[in-house]
Regions:
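Active-site-adjacent structural elements in enzyme catalytic cores
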Residues: 1-213
């Protein structure tokens, strides 16, 4: 199998959404790097993402949403601290980690009981998730341990034989990936440094933000 290259217009986005809803995996541009989209509720599709990336199954996959109202069925609760963060930093490169709904597949959460969510500010990513009509995976479109991809050629070189399609949105901004912030504890913790600095989050929250590890 070789991935189809789809133009990131209405027709290509519609085709990509159909591929995802049929259990396929599609690479698409975000405001940082290319991501891999699959149906978050389809176990076979999730397994395909793990195989394509060579990713260890204990590592969870983050999800992309089109709207904050989609959160309710994915998490146990929405902490008050998360409300302000979503209001100010979504859409954008901030992934928030919540206590996962027990209905989510274990493969998605990596058995951690938590799930990472964000809304991308990239118009193609937004349009794709909206067209699919439900949460999709948003993990980076690269082999595990390799640099993230900001060009279609890089995605194709690493994953072209393992995924179904690539939505060609041109070169992405690159830089740093999304900042990953765990909001499940008493004090927010940055799990992964990224495009939004910890100092900016701490300033907004008016409290210290822990770093882990």
């Amino acid at each position: 199998m070789k991935a189809s290259i789809l133009k990131a217009g209405p027709r290509g986005i519609a085709r990509a959404s159909r591929i995802i809803l049929r259990g396929g995996v599609v690479a698409f541009p975000t405001e940082t790097f290319y991501g891999l989209g699959a149906d978050a509720g389809n176990i076979q599709a999730l397994e395909k993402v793990f195989r394509a990336k060579g990713r260890e199954e204990h590592k969870p996959l983050l999800l992309l949403l089109a709207d904050r109202t989609w959160i309710s069925g994915l998490v146990k609760e929405i902490p008050m601290v998360a409300e302000g963060l979503m209001e100010n930093f979504w859409p954008g490169p901030l992934t928030l980690i919540f206590e996962a709904s027990p209905h989510l597949p274990l493969l998605l959460t990596g058995g951690t009981g938590k799930v990472g969510l964000r809304i991308s500010s990239h118009p193609v990513a937004q349009a794709l998730v909206q067209k699919v009509g439900q949460a999709i995976t948003g993990t980076s479109a690269n082999l595990s341990g390799q640099p993230s991809a900001s060009l279609v050629a890089e995605v194709f070189r690493g994953l072209g034989g393992e995924i179904d399609a690539i939505l060609d949105g041109g070169q992405t901004a690159g830089g740093l990936g999304s900042t990953v912030l765990d909001v499940t504890g008493e004090r927010p913790r940055i799990i992964r440094r990224g495009a939004i600095p910890g100092s900016q989050l701490a300033s907004f929250l008016g409290k210290k933000v822990d770093f882990f590890p």
